[in-house]
A protein has these predicted regions:
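Short loop/turn segments that connect beta-strands within beta-propeller blades
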Residues: 214-217, 253-257, 318-322, 369-373, ...
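Cap/lid segment of the alpha/beta-hydrolase catalytic domain
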Residues: 532-655, 662, 696-704
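Active-site-proximal cap/loop segments of hydrolase catalytic domains
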Residues: 609-816
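Blade-terminus and WD-like Trp-Asp/Gly-His loop motifs, strongest in beta-propeller folds
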Residues: 128, 184-192, 228-238, 271-279, ...
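Non-catalytic accessory segments flanking enzyme active sites
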Residues: 181-188, 192-197, 201-204, 281-284, ...
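Accessory carbohydrate-binding/adhesion or oligomerization-edge regions at the termini
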Residues: 20-74, 135-169
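Aromatic-lined ligand-binding clefts that engage carbohydrates, nucleic acids, or primary amines
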Residues: 99-112, 134
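A flexible loop/linker signature enriched in serine peptidases of the S9 family
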Residues: 178, 197-209, 240-250, 263-269, ...
Length: 816
């Protein structure tokens, strides 16, 4: 049955098409724009075609002029009294499911059609879920008028709506495009700020830029494409450029813009300024021995990684003499951890392999006297430390590492538990007597980045705090930790002035993109400096994000959150997607990520994000549950949480629940299907199907297993490696399961998906496998990521919304 839906200009909201035809009666109009026939130098063009008036329709006119247009509801189109003129008529369609339609345009003779700013050949439309602008550009002639009748025909009843409220759905395009922060840096006196940006344009091109701002006035002093950094003491910034004789080091006064060439022939390699500004510390690379291309020896598992045989060493470049003095020599990697404020001492770390015992890589920490080149060993062969920083006076060292660092002095787990090597801790080392104090043993958040501030002597750090990245300040004298009040769920980066109580930081939250702030560290008050989110989310409609936690059968509180679709109706039933990692870290409240939750919700799903046992940010005992469990306990948390969520929220259709995870989360997706039948669809991206093959073949398989399967090996614990592998339980899976994988993945090799896909095919189960050419563990190529994401959306639409249209459009059915 064919019904008509007539929309007048009084309609200010989207009306769902209740039938197969939508008549468009209200447009936004812009025009007329008079165009003239060009002067004809010749009678024909280069292709031997004569000029006809219809070619004026090809005259460029941006569809953006409609933004300033007026409403038009008449049947006879506006014309022009002056020869030929161009006009624009536009309207907006919206669909939360993939839809095909045919646009009927009657009455117009000379027109062009644009959908989302792109010229459309023909009137057949294939609309991915989004808010779409449709523009008809037509050519009028003086004294002649045209009428217009437009309708949209679709076989998918209720799939398309017509919008007139200037709002739009949040889509992957909003995730990919626009400007984001890439870093911040305060000048030593806190008066100026360097802000780094990264902009991605439609089509995938991206570019970086840097801005220098005077904070007091907000005045922009400079904008450049080079990467600029502050000198450590003087309020000047520096950058490098290619000069006639080689790489140049340029120093700039931010107030005057005056440039000084500090070094004319700067050596290659990464460098940092000494705090005293009289020398540069270089990290250099020495190439290791080469193998033949046609046949080659692999010395140890990591030798399969490109560049593994190369070694790093340190050198000091004297800015007065130009002498590049090597500081270290040998075949072990050496890197700098910190330089003392007086420039006298260097903290440096070395690494060495020890494959026969966990941990298989050992680190040593030295204090090197830059004058005598004599080194003092501070920490010897500790595989659990990760970094170190001097105290402002140089008498102590702030050491970062895991709970097992320094003999396990910072462990806080139950008897029989092995701590997670990814749970970040801080320790205080007194150089004089080598006494070590654990600073975060009873602190649940997992430390990420720490800075010892010279101004107030406090340690500022970010830490995973459940699903947030919170900002903290610690007094190293008594170990007291204070959480700082910030305006975002996640602090992604921060900078402290060397000589002033000023901090700059930026971050985002569950429902907004990047925003930049300054903070007075005495008053502890933040001020918004720049809001990139405002432009990214202009006119975008988002659903709500709410916290939801439950108590599992073991008595633990399992935290989570959920996202609702825009225009949520609690009386409806919605399909739900469950997202998790299930590995060593939480799924943070990033607004933009590999799995942008609001973009899923915009398609009509409730999205439940759960933080099961084993994640950092909840305390050492909780994160230790990741070790030697291989999904046991984690799966129970996800299953119990999903069931309880449905029980407490009647708006979820518990027959239409999907789940998705990547990497270890991909393993969890596969493993879950061997444990439960509550899911109607599942997606595993780059998931582990066999712990033994991943352990042996992945570049970091055996080393990550030091975290997840500490002191366990395929021969010593086959129950863990085999019985907990989905491949050996494939016959228990009955859920439609999609495997996604980059075919160049060196972390979790693509064979992990291939072998599981093969098993399910031989078992006659519903499954699909999509490989992404040339992509590694993450799908980072712009165009391929869009196709990858659409594949995910289409799989869920097929099984959770009973609509295979999108899937069949991407992967056309084949008779093979």
């Amino acid at each position: 049955m064919k019904k008509q839906i007539l929309l007048s200009c009084a309609l200010a909201w989207a009306v769902m098409a209740g039938a197969e035809t939508i008549d468009i009666t209200t447009f936004r109009y812009a025009g007329p724009y008079v165009v003239q026939a060009p002067f004809q130098v010749d009678s024909v063009d280069v292709n031997s075609k004569t000029f006809v008036s219809g070619r004026l329709l090809d005259t460029h006119l941006s569809v953006d002029v409609l933004q300033q247009g007026t409403l038009f509801t008449g049947g006879v189109l506006p014309g022009s009294d002056s020869g030929y003129a161009l006009h624009m008529m536009g309207f907006v369609l919206e669909n939360t499911r993939y839809a095909t339609a045919k646009l009927k345009i009657d009455g117009l003779k000379r027109y062009q059609l644009y959908v989302d700013g792109k010229k459309q050949e023909g009137t057949e439309l294939a609309l991915e879920p989004a808010t779409h602008s449709v523009v008809i550009k037509y050519l009028s002639e003086a004294g002649k008028t045209d009428s217009l009748k437009v309708s949209v025909d679709t076989d998918q009843e209720g799939s398309i709506s017509l919008k007139q409220d200037n709002k739009k759905l949040y889509t992957l395009a909003d995730v990919l495009h626009g400007t984001r922060f890439a870093g911040v840096g305060l000048s030593p006196d806190g008066r100026y700020l360097i802000t780094n940006y990264r902009t991605t344009y439609v089509g995938g091109r991206s570019a970086g830029s840097t801005r220098i701002t005077e904070l007091a006035s907000g005045k922009v002093l400079a904008e450049r494409t080079e990467n600029m950094q502050w000198m450590p003491r003087s309020n000047r910034y520096y950058y490098t450029r290619t000069g006639v004789d080689g790489r140049q080091l340029i120093v700039v006064d931010p107030l005057t813009g005056m440039e000084t060439v500090l070094v004319n022939k700067l050596p290659d390699g990464y460098f940092q300024f000494a705090p005293t500004e009289d020398y540069l510390l270089f990290t250099m690379t020495q190439e290791g021995p080469k193998e033949r291309k046609e046949i080659y020896e692999v010395l140890e598992p990591d030798d399969r990684q490109p560049g593994w045989r190369n070694r790093s060493y340190l050198a000091k470049y004297d800015l007065k003499t130009g002498l590049l003095q090597p500081l270290t020599f040998g075949y072990h990697n050496v890197w700098a951890a910190d330089i003392s404020n007086d420039g006298r001492y260097l903290l440096m770390m070395t690494s060495q392999s020890r494959l026969t015992k966990r941990p298989t890589t050992l680190f040593s920490l030295y204090r090197l006297d830059m004058q005598t080149l004599q080194a003092e060993l501070l920490i010897d062969k500790d595989g659990f430390i990760s970094g170190a920083r001097f105290s402002p006076d140089g008498t102590q060292v702030l050491v970062s590492g895991s709970p097992e660092s320094l003999g396990g002095i910072g462990k806080n787990v139950k008897e029989g538990q092995t701590p997670s090597m990814t749970d970040g801790q801080l320790y205080l080392l007194n150089i004089a007597d080598k006494r070590v104090t654990p600073l975060t043993k009873d602190f649940n958040p997992s430390v990420q980045r720490a800075v010892w501030n010279k101004v107030d002597g406090q340690v500022y750090f970010t830490a995973e705090n459940r699903d947030c990245y919170s900002l903290y300040r610690m007094n190293p004298a008594d170990g007291k930790i204070q959480q700082l009040e910030v305006s975002e769920d996640l602090v992604n980066s921060f900078s402290l002035a060397q000589n002033a109580p000023v901090m700059a930081y930026y971050g985002q939250s569950a429902s907004n993109s990047d925003r930049l702030y300054t903070m007075n560290t005495k008053k502890m008050k933040s001020s918004l400096l720049e809001d990139l989110s405002k432009d990214i989310l202009k006119d975008v409609e988002l659903g709500e994000c709410k916290v939801w936690s439950f108590t599992n059968s073991r008595g633990d509180t399992i935290y989570g959150r959920y996202y609702l679709p825009p225009h949520f109706d609690a009386n409806r039933k919605y399909p739900m997607i469950v997202n998790y990692y299930g590995g060593c870290s939480p799924v943070s409240r990033n607004f933009e990520s590999r799995y942008p939750h609001h973009a899923y919700a915009a398609l009509g799903y409730v999205v439940y994000v759960i933080e099961p046992s084993g994640a950092t940010g909840f305390g050492q005992e909780f994160s230790a549950r990741h070790v030697n469990t291989a999904g046991e306990g984690v799966a129970q948390d996800i299953i119990e949480g999903t069931k309880q969520f449905c029980k407490e929220h009647a708006f979820v259709n518990d027959k239409k629940i999907g789940c998705i995870g990547a990497s270890y989360g991909g393993f969890m997706t596969q493993y879950l299907q061997t444990q439960t039948d509550i899911f109607a669809a599942a997606i595993s991206h780059a998931g582990i199907s066999d712990h033994t093959s991943y352990w042996g073949e992945g570049y970091w398989g055996y080393s990550y297993s030091e975290v997840s399967m500490a002191n366990s090996y395929p021969w010593s614990n086959p129950d863990l490696f085999v019985k907990q592998s989905p491949l050996f339980n494939a016959d228990k899976i009955h859920t439609p399961l999609l495997f996604l994988h980059g075919d160049a993945d060196v972390n979790v090799p693509v064979g992990e998906s291939i072998q599981m896909f093969t098993a399910l095919k031989l078992l006659g189960r519903e499954t699909a496998f999509v490989a992404v050419t040339g992509q590694d563990h993450h799908i980072v190529d712009y165009g391929k990521r869009i196709q990858w994401q659409n594949t995910i959306f289409a799989w869920f639409a097929k099984w959770l919304q009973d609509d295979a249209t999108w899937w069949n459009a991407i992967y056309k059915p084949k008779n093979l």
